[in-house]
C-alpha cells in the first residue's frame, strides 16, 4: 500500500497533462500512487494517460463519465489506498520536493493536514508567491479557533480565508474518512471553498509551511478561472446555501458575518463575469443577481471594511440596485477576481 495517493482529475487536459504527471513522477519521495481520473475527456487525454502509465507503474487510471471536478475528486477519494491524500490539478505542476516536505511535517506534528504556499505562473508575467493570511507553524484546536475561525470562510476585506486550495494540502486519510469529507457535486465552481472550510472547522490540528511555494499554479488562457460561466451565480448560491446549512448556527463560533461577506464576494465575482456578455444581455443578468434576497440582506447587514475604493463604489451600486449605473460601471472596470 502506498504512503501517499495523489489524485489528478482530468478533463480535456491534453495540452498540460504530461507536464503535470512528469512533475509527479519526478518527486523525491517515491512511495506514491498517481491516480489519473479521466472525467469523460473528449480530447486525447485518455490516450495520453495510457502512454504515461507505461512509463511508471505507480500510475493508476480511472475512466468515468463526465461529472465535473468534484465528482472526479470524489472518485479519486474512493479509489485511493494511501495513508495520506493530495490533490493536483491536471494543468498545474509541483516542485520535486513537494510531497516529501509535506509528509515530513504531517508526520512530525501528527496533524490532520499540512499545507504550503503556491507559486502563480502566468504567461508574460513574473511568477508570484501566494501566501495565506496566517503565520506559519503548528496550529492546535485552540489556536485554530483563535486565528482561523475569524476568517475561515471570508475575510473582512472580501478576500478568501487562509484555507482555500486543496491542492497545496496533504491530508491524513483517516481524518477525511472520520469526518466524511467529500466534495459537493452540486457545486460546480470554487469547489475548494466549501471543502476547505469544512476541513478547517473539523481539524484538531494542522501545520502551515509559510513562504515555501512548492505548488505551481499555472493560470492558462481559456481555463475555468479565465472564462465566463453562464451558470456561475446559481452555483455560487448553492455553495452559499450549503455553507449556511453547515455554519449558520454553529455552537463554537458565530460565522454569520462571514456568511454575509461570502455571498457579497461571489455576487461581485458573478457580476464581473457579466462584463464578458453582450451589452443587451447585461441588464437582465445584473437584475437577477442584485434582486437576490440573501444578497440584499447581506448588503444591508454587513458594512464591508478595508476594501479598495473601486470595489466600494461597486458595492454601493449593488446595495441600492442601480442597474443602469452598474452596467456603466462594469463596462469600465476590470473583472473582479
Residue ranges of model-derived segments:
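Short, well-formed alpha-helical segments that are part of the catalytic scaffolds
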Residues: 12-26
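Catalytic core of nucleotide-sugar-dependent glycosyltransferases
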Residues: 204, 211-220, 226-253, 266-269, ...
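Donor-binding/catalytic cores of nucleotide-activated saccharide
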Residues: 69, 90-231
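A conserved acidic beta->alpha catalytic loop
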Residues: 23, 38-47, 65, 89
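Short aromatic/hydrophobic "clamp" motif used to bind/position activated sugar donors
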Residues: 85
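Cell-envelope/extracellular polymer assembly enzymes that use nucleotide-activated donors
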Residues: 2-5, 33, 194
Amino acid at each position: 500500500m502506498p504512503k501517499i495517493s495523489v489524485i489528478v482529475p482530468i478533463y480535456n487536459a491534453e495540452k498540460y497533462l504530461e507536464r503535470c504527471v512528469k512533475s509527479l513522477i519526478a518527486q523525491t519521495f517515491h512511495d506514491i500512487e498517481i491516480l489519473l481520473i479521466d472525467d469523460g475527456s473528449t480530447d486525447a487525454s485518455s490516450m495520453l494517460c495510457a502512454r504515461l502509465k507505461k512509463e511508471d507503474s505507480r500510475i493508476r487510471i480511472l475512466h468515468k463519465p463526465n461529472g465535473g471536478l468534484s465528482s472526479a475528486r470524489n472518485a479519486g477519494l474512493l479509489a485511493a489506498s494511501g495513508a495520506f491524500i493530495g490533490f493536483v490539478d491536471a494543468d498545474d505542476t509541483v516542485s520535486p520536493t513537494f510531497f516529501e516536505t509535506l509528509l515530513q511535517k504531517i508526520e512530525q506534528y501528527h496533524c490532520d493536514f499540512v499545507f504550503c504556499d503556491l507559486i502563480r505562473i502566468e504567461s508574460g508575467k513574473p511568477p508570484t508567491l501566494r501566501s495565506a493570511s496566517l503565520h506559519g507553524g503548528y496550529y492546535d484546536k485552540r489556536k485554530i479557533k483563535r486565528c482561523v475561525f475569524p476568517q475561515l470562510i471570508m475575510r473582512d476585506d472580501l478576500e478568501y480565508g487562509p484555507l482555500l486550495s486543496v491542492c497545496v494540502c496533504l491530508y491524513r486519510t483517516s481524518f477525511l474518512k472520520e469526518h466524511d469529507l467529500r466534495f459537493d457535486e452540486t457545486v460546480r465552481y470554487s469547489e475548494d471553498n466549501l471543502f476547505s472550510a469544512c476541513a478547517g472547522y473539523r481539524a484538531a490540528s494542522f501545520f502551515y509551511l509559510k513562504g515555501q511555494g512548492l505548488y505551481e499554479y499555472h493560470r492558462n488562457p481559456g481555463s475555468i478561472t479565465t472564462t465566463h460561466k453562464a451558470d456561475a451565480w446559481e452555483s455560487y448560491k448553492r455553495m452559499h446555501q450549503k455553507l449556511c446549512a453547515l455554519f449558520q448556527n454553529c455552537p463554537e463560533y458565530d460565522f454569520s458575518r462571514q456568511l454575509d461577506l461570502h455571498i457579497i464576494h461571489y455576487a461581485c465575482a458573478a457580476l464581473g463575469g457579466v462584463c464578458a456578455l453582450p451589452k443587451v444581455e447585461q441588464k437582465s443578468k445584473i437584475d437577477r443577481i442584485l434582486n437576490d434576497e440573501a444578497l440584499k440582506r447581506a448588503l444591508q447587514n454587513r458594512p464591508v471594511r478595508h476594501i479598495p475604493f473601486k470595489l466600494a463604489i461597486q458595492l454601493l451600486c449593488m446595495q441600492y440596485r442601480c442597474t443602469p449605473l452598474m452596467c456603466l460601471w462594469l463596462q469600465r472596470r476590470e473583472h473582479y477576481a
